[in-house]
Amino acid sequence: MSKIFKISFLLFLIFSFTTFKSLSITDALIGTVGNKPLLHSDLINEMKMLLILSGKNFSQENKKELQKVALKSITGRLIKEIEIEKYKFNNFNQNDVDYEINKITEKLNIDLGTLKGSFKTNDINFSTLENRIKTELKWNGLMFNLYKNRVIVN
């Protein structure tokens, strides 16, 4: 791991979670994945979204694990976005996005309004979740298109 990334990540850990709303530090670049920036706000929002989607609350005990999972999640998604852009693949079905959101609400046993309210309460734009789902759908479609002729089903 590069020294800059280690220092940036250490600074992030020091300043994280004192408070989400009153933290007076402006957004900072944590690192990059390819040509895509990874910002402090992206990591915080990913952690919040993971907590919302898992139905869990933040605690100091799960902080480090949550940060690791969030960083891995963002990194994977950025890699997928790079490949999607590389192959100029933008096919997805909006009905599939709606279906995935419905699965989330059913899993959490809440309605769509409550889910959107949770995002608003945590200062996360709901379109972030929609874009995350779209990226997964595009990625799955891209992988299918690239490898459909190589798969043999008996």
Placement of each model-derived feature along the sequence:
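Peptidyl-prolyl cis-trans isomerase
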Residues: 38, 61-154
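Short, low-structural-confidence N-terminal segments
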Residues: 1-72, 121, 144
